[in-house]
Amino acid sequence: MIGFSAFILRNYYAAIGWNEDNLYSSLTRTSSALLDFQLPQSLILQLANSPTPIFFTSYALDALPQLNGSISYITTSMPLDEIGSGRATAFKNVIERFRVFPPPKRPQPKDEVWLGGKRIEGRDYLLYSRLHLPSLHLSGLATTRLTPTLQAHLAFLSQPAHPTSTRPTPPQTPPSHTRQPSEPSTPAPSPTPGNVFISLQHDTGRYCGEYTYSVQDGMVGLRTLYNFGWHGDEESEVDKKERREREGKRIDEEEMMEGGLKGRFSAGGEVYFSAKQRSFGISTGLRFTTVPPTLPLPLNAPVPSPPTTLTLLYNPLIGFLSSAYSAQVSPTVALATRFGVNVYSYESDLSVGGEWWIGRRRGKRGLTTDAEPQLDAESRDPVVTGIEENRELTEKMAQRASLRQVTLRDEIGEDVHAEKELYSPIPAMTDVNAGELAQQISPRLQPQQDLDDERDGVLKARLSGNWQFALLYEARIRNCLVSAGVLADLTGRQHPIRSIGLEVQYFS
């Protein structure tokens, strides 16, 4: 489960139209959500509050093994009206899950606001600070968008200096002769006071570059990511048609074949150098991601390929090669596997993981948001009720029409399959009529329908090559978000359970 500060940052990126996934550091984000998920290490309680759409506070308490806490404050230039209580927040947005991100878009500038002949729209920014107790460590983040495609980050960590106490020598203690009197005493090395990290991101949609600098170790880094087959959002339909006639179809525009995958490629790399440590590093990566099908689907269209992501990473200095494969095998199950090997020492590691969405959908539990109370069947608007019934009927008809083209099962089997698809945590694909009916529904009911289509729990499991087994359960229980995890060593006979943790978050 992601922290409240990361949740605010993601919503801020979505509000300003910044590509969250178009970074080299996010190349393996899909597989990492299933193979590298974090387990609660102890009993953690977190309370978050949103007094205004631009100001947020968070209080965290770590009870075990020792009492620690923190206080956080966040403010943004963009009002984040979609962030509310834990009951109204979409559960899929507060956890790390399998997700195939859409193709990146070129960030657009803010809408111009003029007053007295001057532009007053201001600049997008986010300010975050966190005070750790009782250590009094202070960390913070400041990000702002300099241009529509250029964004700057400044992160810092400040540690208080510990007072140096001198212990007097008792009078009865004889003087020590292990050191000459004229030899100066060597003071203990003082801890590092802190660090400042500066990052500059340049995102054009097709290309993204990230330039970083760390003050503590003098490390300079460069990360790049390039998306193949990207032509931008500004290309009109006429230009696309002329380009296809002139160049022909690209590989990712070919018609799908049975059993094939239709997707896009992304390639990138990173280079970093530390002046103080005199170290140098380099790595390269490649990612293939399937492209979601364009709706509505033709009646004779083949079965769309399942959401799939493949990644390949290579570090030539240490000879480490890693490949990962993740896919959604069913509406409620996603699996991932990763194999890493060192080409110099032939040491290898294999990890297998997955997630399973469990629990009933919120609509089946009869839950509603705080802004709109639950209505009885007799008091509901008959027009809205008719639209919802027509929407469900249209979804069934669209799925049955697509199933008849790819299967020879009888009508009963198709009806059962179509009915099961309606209870998936992922919204079902609809045709043009279903889209028109969905647009006719009042915007007031749209957020409630999105919440009703999701499930309220997910179970994750991971098995590593060293026989470390991790199990994580994340769910929404009333107004709280609960995360419980356990880490076990399958080879340990005396102490197979390594750690158990519980985290509870409450948004108000």
From Swiss-Prot:
Chief localization: mitochondrion
InterPro entries, per database record: Mdm10
GO terms under cellular component: ERMES complex; SAM complex
Its membrane topology: Multi-pass membrane protein
Protein name: Mitochondrial distribution and morphology protein 10
Region: Disordered, residue numbers: 160-195
Recorded family membership: Belongs to the MDM10 family.
Keywords from the UniProt entry: Membrane, Mitochondrion, Mitochondrion outer membrane, Transmembrane, Transmembrane beta strand
Function per UniProt: Component of the ERMES/MDM complex, which serves as a molecular tether to connect the endoplasmic reticulum and mitochondria. Components of this complex are involved in the control of mitochondrial shape and protein biogenesis and may function in phospholipid exchange. MDM10 is involved in the late assembly steps of the general translocase of the mitochondrial outer membrane (TOM complex). Functions in the TOM40-specific route of the assembly of outer membrane beta-barrel proteins, including the association of TOM40 with the receptor TOM22 and small TOM proteins.
Pfam families documented for this protein: MDM10
Location in or out of the cell: Mitochondrion outer membrane
Superkingdom to which the source organism belongs: Eukaryota
Self-association and partners: Component of the ER-mitochondria encounter structure (ERMES) or MDM complex, composed of MMM1, MDM10, MDM12 and MDM34. Associates with the mitochondrial outer membrane sorting assembly machinery SAM(core) complex.
GO biological processes: establishment of mitochondrion localization; mitochondrial genome maintenance; mitochondrial outer membrane translocase complex assembly; mitochondrion-endoplasmic reticulum membrane tethering; phospholipid transport; protein insertion into mitochondrial outer membrane
Keyword Thylakoid appears in the UniProt entry: no
Domain notes: Lacks alpha-helical transmembrane segments, suggesting that it resides in the membrane via beta-sheet conformations similar to those predicted for other outer membrane proteins and porin.
Transmembrane listed as a keyword: yes
